[in-house]
């Protein structure tokens, strides 16, 4: 098996060819893929056309699978595999209401957020429905030294849904909400494999900054978010059926797009990889 890595943007993202994810990989390939994900943060495996069992095995290359939170969107025979389907999305003014239509990192209100998330494209509309990624490592690197010193020791409370969330969340019962954690996370984290610093942002879940009043805290969050989502930090993935894409939630944020014909069918499988508690870069 001859693995080939093709960078897709100046700072992150790589296309991986020369590997068939419908077959088990050996330890050398496994270790190389793990290292490549840590370095490039987003890996695209084209033309894989994976079945659910293949997706489970492919995810396990990178670690143990993490249960899906939205239990009504999982495969009965493969409970670790979720799905995103247009058939489950509401319409408002002729536009699909897509979950995740704002840059974020998955389940940041978990004590141990997923280290990675992956999608496998089954059915894709003719146009639109891209997934965008931004490199929050490079975004931190490009901050002024003064701002780095200011934010490097800061922390933020992450909840199910921020009081100033810009995006739609699935409505939950009071009983379900009571089961969902709230956790204080570092504003700047250290990647456990590479040691790189990265901004840790999720405007849908962050409830201000410790030690600042709410208005000041949200102003800082929004300023960092605007900086981190600038076009120079972006890779935009245009989906093709058969794509398997995995990304490192500790190095990038991502967002969905609802800019496609709601009458066209879009269906992707989804898995998450277990992570550890986040490490503050200041530690």
State where each predicted segment sits.
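Non-heme Fe(II) oxygenase catalytic core, chiefly the N-lobe of the double-stranded beta-helix
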Residues: 2-244, 249-283
């Amino acid at each position: 098996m001859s693995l080939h890595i093709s960078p897709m943007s100046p700072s992150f993202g790589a296309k991986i060819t020369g590997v068939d994810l419908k077959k088990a990989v050996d330890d050398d390939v496994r270790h190389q893929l793990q290292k490549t994900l840590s370095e490039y943060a987003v890996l695209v495996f084209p033309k894989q056309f994976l079945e659910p069992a293949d997706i489970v095995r492919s995810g396990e290359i990178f670690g143990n699978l993490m249960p899906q939170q939205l239990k009504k969107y999982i495969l009965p025979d493969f409970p670790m595999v979720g799905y995103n389907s247009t058939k489950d999305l509401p319409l408002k003014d002729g536009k699909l209401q897509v979950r995740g239509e704002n840059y974020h990192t998955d389940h940041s209100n978990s004590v141990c957020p997923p280290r990675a998330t992956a999608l496998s494209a089954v059915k894709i509309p003719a146009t639109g429905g891209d997934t965008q990624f931004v490199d929050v490592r490079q975004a931190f690197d490009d901050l002024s030294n003064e701002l780095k010193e200011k934010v490097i020791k800061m922390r933020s409370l992450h909840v199910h849904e921020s009081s100033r969330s810009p995006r739609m969340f699935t409505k939950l019962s009071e009983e379900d909400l009571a089961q969902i954690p709230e956790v204080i996370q570092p504003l700047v984290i250290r990647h456990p494999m590479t040691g790189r610093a990265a901004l840790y942002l999720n405007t849908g879940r962050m409830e201000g900054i410790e030690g600042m009043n709410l208005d000041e805290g949200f102003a800082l969050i929004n300023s960092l978010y605007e900086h981190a989502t600038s076009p120079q930090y972006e890779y935009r993935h245009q989906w093709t059926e058969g794509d398997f894409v995995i990304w490192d939630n500790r190095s990038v944020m991502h967002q969905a797009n609802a800019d496609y014909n709601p009458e066209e069918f879009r269906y992707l499988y989804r898995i998450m990889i277990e992570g550890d508690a986040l490490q503050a870069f200041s530690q």
